[in-house]
């Protein structure tokens, strides 16, 4: 019985070390300031963003916000992450979790890199961890990231 308990604990601990990551990027023919303005105008998300359909709350470091996402071919999901980093024109990140830390956590990050030639590399990534991460299929979420990136690119380059 003791051996089974120890094996179970070891198994659960190994699952917490598992992680998955999605990373997408695109080069946009616009300055970081222009892209940041679009990216942080959350009230406009329903009009252009096919993946993150809503962000409410004050987006400042350590604040809790409410985010609605709609991965392709999936139902809408709502979660309440904490803002980790907000550096104007450069980076925005948050940490979301399922019920409590360690079950299923996601650290989402948007990064803007000024290429010095009038273009910006936009990187969107998320690192997933926790004991339930092995159940998560990243395919639809990555597709949603790419769709959002493309719409952001189109909007920034057309206005």
Walk through the language-model features, giving the residues of each.
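Bacterial Sec-dependent N-terminal signal peptides
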Residues: 1-21
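Hydrophobic ligand-binding cavity/cleft-lining segments
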Residues: 15-60, 147, 151
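Envelope-exposed proteins and targeting segments
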Residues: 22-24, 63, 79, 108, ...
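A short, structured loop/turn motif at beta-sheet edges
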Residues: 29-32, 60, 84-90, 111-121, ...
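Hydrophobic pocket/interface hotspot
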Residues: 34-39, 45, 65-67, 83, ...
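N-terminal, post-signal-peptide region of Sec/Tat-exported proteins
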Residues: 46-82
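Hydrophobic-ligand binding "helix-grip"
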Residues: 73-117, 127-130
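A conserved amphipathic terminal alpha-helix motif
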Residues: 104, 109, 121-159
């Amino acid at each position: 019985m003791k051996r089974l308990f120890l094996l179970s604990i070891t198994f659960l601990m190994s699952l917490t070390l598992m992680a998955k990551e999605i990373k997408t990027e695109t080069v946009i023919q616009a300055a970081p300031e222009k892209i940041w303005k679009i990216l942080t105008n959350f009230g406009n998300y329903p009009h252009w963003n096919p993946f993150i359909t809503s962000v409410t709350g004050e987006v400042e470091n350590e604040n809790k916000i409410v985010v609605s996402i709609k991965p392709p071919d999936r139902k809408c999901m709502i979660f309440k992450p904490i803002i980790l980093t907000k550096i104007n024109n450069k980076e925005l990140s948050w940490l979301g979790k399922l019920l409590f830390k360690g079950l299923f956590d996601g650290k989402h990050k948007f990064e803007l890199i000024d290429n010095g030639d009038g273009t910006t590399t936009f990187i969107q990534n998320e690192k997933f961890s926790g004991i339930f991460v092995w159940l998560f299929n990243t395919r639809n979420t990555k597709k949603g990231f790419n769709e959002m990136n493309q719409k952001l690119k189109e909007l920034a380059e057309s206005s």
